Amino acid sequence: MTMRAARLSGSTGLTAALVAVLLVLTGCASLPESSAPQALGTIDREPTSEGPTPPIAGRDPDLLLRDFLQATADPTNRHLAARQYMTPAASAQWDDSTSTTIVEKPDTLLESRDGDRATYRIRAQRMAELSADGAYRAVNEPTLENKIEMVKVDGEWRIAELPDGVVMDITAFTKSYRRYVLYFADPSGNTAVPDLRWLSVPKNQLTQRLLSLLSEGPHGAIGAVVRNQLAAPVALRGPITKANGDPDDVGVGLGGVRLDFAGAAALSQRDKELLAGQVVLTLAQADIPGPYMLLADGRPLDERYATNGWSAADVEYLSPSVQAQNRIGLHALRDGALTQVTDNGVVETPGYFGSVNNLQSAALSPDGQLVAAVADAGRPAPEPPRTLMVGTYGGPAFPVAEGGSITRPSWTGDGSAAWAVIDGDRVIRAVNDRATGTVSVQGVDISGLTADPAGPALRLPITELRISRTGVRAALIADGKVYVAVVERRPDGGYALTAPVPVAVGLSTKATSLSWIGGDTLLIAREGNIDPVSTVLIDGSEWTPVTSQNLTPPVRVITAAPGAQYVADSRGVLELTSNTTSELHYWTEMPGLVGTDAAPVLPG
C-alpha cells in the first residue's frame, strides 16, 4: 500500500455505497401510503449481550497487550471490555475520555521482564483521532509510543500502568464502529449538508444517539456556516417511540419512529420542512426505517403527513447526492473547444465556447446555462498567458480575469458564481448577475488557509479548487496535498476559505486533480502508476483505490457525479463502467475523445 488510510474499509467500494443509499431511499419510499402506520414487530432484533468476553487465561503478556488493543474498540460501559485487562487500581485510575487514537500495525516491544513484572512499549503508526461526538480526523503525525507496566495477578498478566486515553487497532475499529451521517441545512435552506460520525452503538439505542448528536449540532468549523433546526428553542419532547407509541426497540426492525419536538410549532413552514429533512435523512441513512411520525408540540409537524408519516422520498430533494446528479449530459474539451457527447457522437457546442480552439479547461453551471473556461491568450511574455472567460452556453463570452496560471473553474450549486485560483495564491469568484447579464469579480480571503490557528497551515500553490454542491465546503489541492476547507460568507458579503483539513493523508505522490461525488466523497487523481485514482471521504476515512484497469497514466483530469466518473489519461477520456454480470469495474474509452488535449466536463 502506498497510503496508510487505505486500510480503513468500513464500507465497500464507492458503487456499493451509492447503491446502498438508493436502496434506503427507495425502500422507504415504497411504504404503503393509503393506511395509518402499524408497528410490525422487530424482525432484526439484536441478541442481548451477556457482557464482554474476558481475557484469555494463561495469555503471554505481549499477546495480552494485542488483545487489549482490540478490546479498546468496545466503548460500552466506559470501555469495560478493555478494563478487564487491567488491575483494579489501574482501571480506577485510567481516564478513557481524554482522547481516542486509531493506529495500525501496533508492535509490542519488551523493555524488561523480572519475575511477575514486565515493561512493554506499544509502538504504532497513528492513523486518526476520534472525538467524543464520533468525528473522525485523519492524521499524519509521529509514531505513537506508550509505555505499559504489567504485573501478574493470581497467575494472570494484567496491565498495571498505562497512559490515559484510548488507543485502538484499526482492524478492531472497523469491526466495532460504523459510519453515520448527520444532516444540517445550508445557509439558503436549499440542501442538506452532511457531517460524518463514527459510532459504536447498539441498534436499539441508535435513534436516540443520532438525535442527541443532531441537537448538539455540527462538529468543528462547519458549525459556523450551516443551520440546525433541531437546536434551541426546538428540542425533543417526551420519549422516542415506534410509530404506534411502543417504546421498546425503536429503530430495530419495522415499525417506524415517532418523535415530538417542543418549540417546533412556532417554526415557519419552510423551517419545519428543513427540520423534517434533517431528521429523516439522518435516520434513513442509518437504516432506521420509517414511517417517521413527526410532531410539533404534540400535533403533526405538517398536516400533509399526519396520517402516513414522512418517508425518505418526501425529503430526498434536499439530499446532496440527489442534487449532484448530472442532468445535462457529458461534455468535453477536444482540440481546444467545448463539445457535447451525444448518442450520435461528439459534436461542437454552439456559441463562443464551441467555436474556439484555445480552451485549456472548462466548467458548466449545474443547469447548463453558463460556462466558465480558461483560455490560452496567445500573448508573448511577459503578458499573462491565461484568461478566464465566462459566458452563456451557446452564446457569447467575455474575459473576467487573467494570470500566469488559472485553475479549472468550479461553479456553485446555484450557478451564481464560478470560482478559480489565479497564479496559485489568489482565489476569485466570478459572480454572475442573471438579471443584468453582467459578471463581477470578487476576491476571496484565503488567510485562514495559510495561517489557520486550529491546525497546520497548508502550503501554496493551490492547483485545484472544487466547490461542493452544498456550497459550504471546498476541496482543494495545495502543494500536491488534498484538503477540505470551509466556505464562509462574511457579514459584508465577502467570502473566505477557512479551517483546511487534510483528507488524503499519507499519499506517496502528489495529487493532480479532484472532483466531488455527492456531498461527502471525493474522487482523486495523483501522479504515478500505482492506484492513480481513488476515493476518500471528507473526514479522511475510507480511502479506497479505484480500479486502474485500462488506464494509461498519468491521469490528467477527473470529474464525477453520483453514478458517473470520468478521467483523462495519456490516451484520452475514459468512463468507469462495470460488468453487468459481475462486480468487476474497469475504464472504457469514450469514442471520439482521444488525444492528450481531451478532457471530460460535467456540471459543477
From Swiss-Prot:
Instruction: Identify where the record puts lipid attachment of type S-diacylglycerol cysteine.
Output: 28
Subcellular location(s) of the protein: Cell membrane
Q: Where is the signal peptide?
A: 1-27
Which Pfam families does the record cross-reference, listed alphabetically? Germane, Gmad1
Using the UniProt record, give the first listed, main subcellular location.
membrane
Its membrane topology is listed as: Lipid-anchor
- Disordered: region residues: 35-60
Q: Does the keyword Cell membrane apply?
A: yes
Q: Which SUPFAM superfamilies match?
A: DPP6 N-terminal domain-like (SSF82171)
List the SMART domains hit by this protein, alphabetically: Germane
Per the record, lipidation of type N-palmitoyl cysteine is found at 28
The UniProt keywords, alphabetically, are:
Cell membrane, Lipoprotein, Membrane, Palmitate, Signal
For this record, the Gene Ontology CC terms, alphabetical, are: plasma membrane
Concerning HAMAP family, the annotation shows: LpqB_lipoprot
The similarity annotation says: Belongs to the LpqB lipoprotein family.
Q: What is this protein called?
A: Lipoprotein LpqB
Q: Which organism is it from?
A: Nocardia farcinica (strain IFM 10152)
